[in-house]
């Protein structure tokens, strides 16, 4: 009976799977730490931005000599809080990107585990 697989690669598969699994676990651990930090930063920048936004909005309304429309108020507040809004968007994007990287690493880990399980069930 002819073997359909490369015997040399087949012999090294358990070690490759173990190395792949350990590598992905390390990556996931790093990403979890990074995601926690990104989550905290995103929460702080969001809270800061929203608090400043509310404060500025009240100040604009209180200091208005004539009644302003809501779009005019929002435009004035937005122009004063550009930096804070940008910091909030960047922090939010970092959190999203880190979360996606974590999901990708978890998928790779699942693939390595599936490969190892397939090898074991095939009698390897």
Could you describe each region identified by the protein language model?
Residues 2-3, 121-124:
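Short acidic DE-rich linear segments
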């Amino acid at each position: 009976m002819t073997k359909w697989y490369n015997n040399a690669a087949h012999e090294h598969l358990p070690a490759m799977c173990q190395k792949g699994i350990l590598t992905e676990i390390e990556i996931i651990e790093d990403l979890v730490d990074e995601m926690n930090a990104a989550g905290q930063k995103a929460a702080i920048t969001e809270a800061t931005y929203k608090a400043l936004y509310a404060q500025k909005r009240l100040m604009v309304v209180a200091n208005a000599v004539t009644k302003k429309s809501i779009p005019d108020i929002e435009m004035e507040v937005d122009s004063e809080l550009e930096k804070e809004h940008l910091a909030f968007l960047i922090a939010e994007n970092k959190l999203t990107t880190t979360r996606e990287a974590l999901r990708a690493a978890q998928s790779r880990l699942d693939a390595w585990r599936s490969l190892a399980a397939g090898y074991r069930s095939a009698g390897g």
